[in-house]
């Protein structure tokens, strides 16, 4: 029967094979056609790397199936894995290695079972079935290893009503995960939750470890009420604009709402409250701006200073 082999360059090779051919046989045929030594070939089908001793039939590869050929570079590449204790492990890998493979190599070196490993790169937790290439992990990249402790740890979440919720979490849980756990316990949709720790609002994609939230830490849950609150903005002409906002809105957000209503670009707006000019990155809560507060809008003239 005929099968196709597609290379990373997009070239497609046609091979005459039989179901009983082993992967070794197929690699030998590719060598005959393309001159690529078998030890530099990795063949992938249906997302799985094919093992030399197995047959095409073993993998249910039928006529006109397409295999993908990835080149195994001689010597592969080195990457580093940094643990929370600060220790750095060096691994020999290839771009086509899966995250499972990498965890197995870490187990070989350090004795840590894969199911207790979480690998992070560029702020993202890496999924087992994906490859290093999928995450654009290149030579000498550094991954971060977070241990998934059996049983994790407990943290507390205190609501504005004074109620305290206990959650079972792990350091590597993201804020999204924590909000999902709160939803499971309390029925509050994640998009209505804002979590605060050490005076900072926590961002969804970050982990508890990123914020140094440890066992028995207490987070504060503020509800993002639909409709929030009203504030007023008074212009120099004496006109008053009413805005729907939330305490956690930033000054940038408020300027964008003013632009929507009045057409004034944010870079021409200066907002004043209690004699202070308000800074873009700060929130209304930072300035203790509450419902029905009045801000003053001064226009920053083009060409001004």
From Swiss-Prot:
<dbReference type="InterPro" id="IPR050158">
    <property type="entry name" value="Ubiquitin_ubiquitin-like"/>
</dbReference>
<comment type="function">
    <text>Ubiquitin exists either covalently attached to another protein, or free (unanchored). When covalently bound, it is conjugated to target proteins via an isopeptide bond either as a monomer (monoubiquitin), a polymer linked via different Lys residues of the ubiquitin (polyubiquitin chains) or a linear polymer linked via the initiator Met of the ubiquitin (linear polyubiquitin chains). Polyubiquitin chains, when attached to a target protein, have different functions depending on the Lys residue of the ubiquitin that is linked: Lys-48-linked is involved in protein degradation via the proteasome.</text>
</comment>
<keyword id="KW-0832">Ubl conjugation</keyword>
<feature type="domain" description="Ubiquitin-like 1">
    <location>
        <begin position="1"/>
        <end position="76"/>
    </location>
</feature>
<feature type="cross-link" description="Glycyl lysine isopeptide (Lys-Gly) (interchain with G-Cter in ubiquitin)">
    <location>
        <position position="48"/>
    </location>
</feature>
<keyword id="KW-0539">Nucleus</keyword>
<dbReference type="InterPro" id="IPR019956">
    <property type="entry name" value="Ubiquitin_dom"/>
</dbReference>
<protein>
    <recommendedName>
        <fullName>Polyubiquitin</fullName>
    </recommendedName>
</protein>
<dbReference type="InterPro" id="IPR019954">
    <property type="entry name" value="Ubiquitin_CS"/>
</dbReference>
<dbReference type="Pfam" id="PF00240">
    <property type="entry name" value="ubiquitin"/>
</dbReference>
<keyword id="KW-0963">Cytoplasm</keyword>
<feature type="propeptide">
    <location>
        <position position="305"/>
    </location>
</feature>
<keyword id="KW-1017">Isopeptide bond</keyword>
<dbReference type="InterPro" id="IPR000626">
    <property type="entry name" value="Ubiquitin-like_dom"/>
</dbReference>
<feature type="cross-link" description="Glycyl lysine isopeptide (Gly-Lys) (interchain with K-? in acceptor proteins)">
    <location>
        <position position="76"/>
    </location>
</feature>
<dbReference type="InterPro" id="IPR029071">
    <property type="entry name" value="Ubiquitin-like_domsf"/>
</dbReference>
<feature type="domain" description="Ubiquitin-like 3">
    <location>
        <begin position="153"/>
        <end position="228"/>
    </location>
</feature>
<dbReference type="GO" id="GO:0005634">
    <property type="term" value="C:nucleus"/>
</dbReference>
<feature type="domain" description="Ubiquitin-like 4">
    <location>
        <begin position="229"/>
        <end position="304"/>
    </location>
</feature>
<dbReference type="GO" id="GO:0016567">
    <property type="term" value="P:protein ubiquitination"/>
</dbReference>
<comment type="similarity">
    <text>Belongs to the ubiquitin family.</text>
</comment>
<dbReference type="GO" id="GO:0003729">
    <property type="term" value="F:mRNA binding"/>
</dbReference>
<dbReference type="GO" id="GO:0031625">
    <property type="term" value="F:ubiquitin protein ligase binding"/>
</dbReference>
<dbReference type="GO" id="GO:0031386">
    <property type="term" value="F:protein tag activity"/>
</dbReference>
<dbReference type="GO" id="GO:0005737">
    <property type="term" value="C:cytoplasm"/>
</dbReference>
<dbReference type="GO" id="GO:0019941">
    <property type="term" value="P:modification-dependent protein catabolic process"/>
</dbReference>
<keyword id="KW-0677">Repeat</keyword>
<feature type="domain" description="Ubiquitin-like 2">
    <location>
        <begin position="77"/>
        <end position="152"/>
    </location>
</feature>
């Amino acid at each position: 029967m005929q099968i196709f082999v597609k290379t990373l360059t997009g070239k497609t090779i046609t091979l005459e094979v039989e179901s009983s051919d082993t992967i070794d046989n197929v690699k030998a045929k590719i060598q005959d056609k393309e001159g690529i030594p078998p030890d530099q070939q990795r063949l992938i089908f249906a997302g799985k790397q094919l093992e030399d001793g197995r047959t095409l039939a073993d993998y249910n590869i039928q006529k006109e199936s397409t295999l993908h050929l990835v080149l195994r570079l001689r010597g592969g590449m080195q990457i580093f894995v940094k643990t929370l204790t600060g220790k750095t492990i060096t691994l020999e890998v290839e771009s086509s290695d899966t995250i499972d493979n990498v965890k197995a190599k870490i187990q070989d070196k350090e004795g840590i079972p894969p199911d207790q490993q979480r690998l992070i790169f560029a702020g993202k937790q890496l999924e087992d079935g994906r490859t290093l290439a999928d995450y654009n992990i290149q030579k000498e990249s550094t991954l971060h290893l977070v241990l998934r402790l059996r049983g994790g740890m407990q943290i507390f979440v205190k609501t504005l009503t004074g109620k305290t919720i206990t959650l079972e979490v792990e350091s590597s849980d993201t804020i999204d995960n924590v909000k999902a756990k709160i939803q499971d316990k309390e029925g509050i949709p994640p998009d209505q939750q804002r979590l605060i720790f050490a005076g900072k609002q926590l961002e969804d994609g970050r982990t508890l470890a990123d914020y140094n939230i440890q066992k028995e830490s207490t987070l504060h849950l503020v509800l993002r009420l639909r409709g929030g609150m009203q504030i007023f903005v008074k212009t120099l002409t004496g006109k008053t604009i009413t805005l729907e906002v939330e305490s956690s809105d930033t000054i940038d957000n408020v300027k964008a709402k003013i632009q929507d209503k009045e057409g004034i670009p944010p870079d021409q707006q200066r907002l004043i409250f209690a004699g202070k000019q308000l800074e873009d990155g700060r929130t209304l809560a930072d300035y203790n701006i509450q419902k029905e507060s009045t801000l003053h809008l001064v226009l920053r003239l083009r060409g001004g200073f």
